[in-house]
């Protein structure tokens, strides 16, 4: 055996990519430990697999991944008892990028399976050989000493990551690998046992291979639980274990409202363990719209940014683990491979099916209503954002109603519609109580027509996107003159409305350009006026939201509708026919309609004065008649 140290240049691809890997590819420095632990776990898994056909390669009983910081020497060592590497392996796997031994082994294993050989497949993750180089984010020099299982020779690979590496003979008592990182000055935190423990529990808690951390006194502490709960059969998992795992992944204190645990098999294989919380999070869900489902590949946590569920299901927490996903160059920058897209679709379908099943369970209707109170506003976002899924989401929604005391659904609403009723009517405002007392509902109540009351922040957006449900159009009661002509008022026959042509003309003239039209309406009973839109654009609530956001609204002004049977309107009509100037009264009517709809008067001071004057006139009448 030659004692000469061999110096080699990195492969051309390494020279080009090493700087990228170290400085740009990884967005979080702590990922270096995930990569090195993953490699060590892979090596251990590979030796266990090869020992199935070669007993001489059997793992020692205490096989583990050991992480040992040394503050005095400023080194961090990651050791394993895995398959190890020969001199050729070190040169091939660490001297070139994207050619790891694990990837070559997976290819060889696939060839063996195609030939009808062993069908057992170890969980191997390092399909791209860039993870090792992340060590140079925290180390200015790395040495790797390894002995291949079944061989007596050991070799040391060393590099400062600047274009070359050395190989020299070494000694190692048992097969396996030691990676020694000579830490940079700004990486002291990774010489602290508590920091290492935190990183391991975050990124590798469910790796099957035991992981231990050795402290300064030489004491070893287990750093991972080593069992991927989602990989166990449901029959072997207790309810308490599910709850504990849910609290771990959600950082919550409640119990899961729903637990989904399944194994997808066939052309696409993955395991899912998902939870729907029973409580809303303390922080508003609008602040963080990312999916809360973690992606694992062969038990190893890859990322929580794979968007495995759409934003409108972001209240769901959990894990999806697959053996079939081809990893891209870096795990935290995993791109949308076709396999991942299929997994997303399958996981989303599973969650929707679960919610659909629970929404139809009449015996547990109150439980579903509680869920909807917690997460309904988020679910509604799916109508606006997900064209493909709108038809599946709509039946899951629940609403307050002008006629029902509790919650109702779109299917239930349609089942109660009057035979001559053409549309599903809804009204949007900021507050449910304001909705219940809205003048917009008077004509509908008089005819026994149900109106859905919408008060969530997203309710101004999604109804127009849904458009219709079961071939019934959704129509805001503020959008144009709702067609109530076919619906007779219940009870007494409606009094014939007087002609108000003179008043209508006077109001139009006085209110231009603040209104686009003035017209009489049969949808008011107790109120004198109400606002409407033309029906060709956003409803009134959407227009208000646009104004609050400073975006304005380029459409037409609202329509002022007046109640021809109201005493105030009749009185104003008489004054209009007598030729009086009604400009001030017209402005007060418009502001009154705005206030009724939860908006502000155009000029609050002028409106207050008008109201005060009207009250003063009312108070003076008894004195005048005395």
From Swiss-Prot:
- Places the protein is found: Cytoplasm
Region C, annotated ranges: 545-626
Instruction: Provide the Gene Ontology terms for cellular component.
Output: cytoplasm
Q: Which InterPro entries match?
A: HATPase_C_sf, Heat_shock_protein_90_CS, HSP90_C, Hsp90_fam, Hsp90_N, Ribosomal_Su5_D2-typ_SF
Q: Which SUPFAM superfamilies match?
A: ATPase domain of HSP90 chaperone/DNA topoisomerase II/histidine kinase, HSP90 C-terminal domain, Ribosomal protein S5 domain 2-like
Provide the residue span(s) of the region labelled B: 332-544
Which is one GO molecular function term here?
Answer: ATP-dependent protein folding chaperone
The protein's UniProt keywords, in alphabetical order, are: ATP-binding, Chaperone, Cytoplasm, Nucleotide-binding, Stress response
- The segments labelled A in the record are 1-331
Its chief place of residence is cytoplasm
List the PROSITE patterns: HSP90
| Superkingdom, taxonomy of origin | Bacteria
Q: Which family does it belong to?
A: Belongs to the heat shock protein 90 family.
Task: State how it assembles.
Answer: Homodimer.
NCBIfam families found in the cross-reference section = PRK05218.1
Role description = Molecular chaperone. Has ATPase activity.
Query: What is the protein's name according to its record?
Result: Chaperone protein HtpG
Origin species:
Methylorubrum extorquens (strain PA1)
Species classification: Bacteria, Pseudomonadati, Pseudomonadota, Alphaproteobacteria, Hyphomicrobiales
The gene coding this protein: htpG
């Amino acid at each position: 055996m030659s004692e000469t140290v061999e110096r080699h240049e990195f492969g051309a691809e390494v020279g080009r990519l090493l700087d990228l890997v170290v400085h740009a590819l990884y967005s979080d420095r702590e990922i270096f430990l995930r990569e090195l632990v993953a490699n060590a776990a892979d090596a251990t898994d590979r030796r266990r697999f090869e020992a199935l056909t070669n007993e001489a390669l059997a793992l020692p009983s205490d096989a583990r991944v050991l992480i040992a910081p040394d503050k005095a020497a400023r080194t961090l060592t990651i050791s394993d008892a895995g398959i190890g590497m020969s001199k050729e392996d070190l040169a091939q796997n660490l001297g070139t990028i994207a050619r790891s031994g694990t990837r070559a082994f997976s290819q060889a294993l696939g060839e063996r399976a195609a030939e009808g050989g062993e069908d057992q497949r170890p969980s191997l993750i390092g399909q791209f050989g860039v993870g090792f180089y992340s060590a140079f984010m925290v180390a200015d020099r790395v040495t790797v000493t390894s002995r291949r299982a079944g061989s007596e020779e050991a070799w040391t690979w060393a590099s400062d990551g600047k274009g070359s590496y050395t190989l020299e003979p070494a000694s190692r008592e048992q097969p396996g690998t030691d990676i020694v990182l000579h830490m940079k000055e700004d990486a002291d935190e990774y010489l602290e046992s508590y920091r290492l423990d935190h990183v391991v529990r975050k990124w590798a808690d469910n790796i099957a291979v035991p992981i231990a951390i050795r402290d300064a006194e030489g004491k070893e502490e287990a750093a991972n639980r080593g069992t991927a709960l989602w990989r166990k059969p449901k029959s072997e998992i207790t309810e308490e274990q599910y709850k504990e795992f849910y609290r771990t992944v959600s950082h919550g204190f409640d119990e899961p409202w729903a637990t989904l645990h399944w194994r997808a098999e066939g052309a696409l294989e993955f395991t899912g363990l998902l939870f729907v919380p029973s409580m809303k999070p303390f922080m508003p869900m609008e602040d963080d719209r990312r999916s809360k489902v973690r992606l694992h590949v062969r038990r190893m946590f890859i990322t929580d940014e794979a968007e495995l569920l759409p934003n409108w299901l972001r209240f769901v927490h959990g894990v999806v683990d697959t053996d079939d996903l081809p990893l891209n160059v870096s795990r935290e920058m995993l791109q949308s491979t076709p396999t991942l897209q299929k997994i997303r679709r399958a996981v989303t379908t599973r969650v929707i099916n679960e919610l659909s099943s629970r929404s139809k369970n009449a015996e547990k209707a109150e439980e579903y209503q509680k869920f909807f109170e917690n997460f309904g506003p988020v679910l509604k976002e799916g109508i606006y954002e997900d064209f493909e899924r709108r038809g599946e989401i709509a039946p899951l929604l629940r609403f307050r109603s002008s006629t029902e005391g509790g919650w109702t659904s779109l299917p239930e609403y349609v089942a109660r519609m009057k035979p001559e009723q053409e549309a599903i009517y809804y009204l949007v405002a900021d507050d449910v109580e304001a909705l219940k007392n809205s003048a917009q509902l008077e004509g509908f109540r008089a005819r026994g027509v149900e109106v859905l009351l919408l008060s969530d922040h997203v309710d101004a957006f999604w109804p127009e996107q849904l458009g219709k449900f079961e071939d019934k159009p959704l129509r805001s009661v503020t959008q144009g003159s709702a067609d109530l002509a076919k619906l007779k008022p219940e009870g007494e026959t409606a009094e014939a409305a007087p002609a108000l042509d003179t008043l209508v003309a006077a109001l139009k003239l006085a209110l231009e350009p603040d209104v686009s039209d003035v017209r009489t309406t049969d949808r008011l009973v107790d109120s004198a006026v109400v606002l409407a839109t033309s029906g060709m654009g956003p409803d009134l609530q959407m227009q208000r939201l646009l104004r609050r956001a400073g975006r304005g609204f380029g459409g037409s002004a609202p329509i002022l509708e007046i109640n021809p049977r109201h005493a105030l309107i009749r009185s104003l009509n008489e004054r209009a026919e007598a030729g009086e100037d009604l400009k001030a009264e017209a402005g007060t009517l418009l502001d009154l309609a705005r206030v009724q709809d939860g908006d502000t008067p155009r000029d609050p001071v002028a409106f207050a004065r008008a109201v005060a004057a009207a009250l003063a006139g009312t108070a003076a009448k008894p004195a005048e008649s005395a």
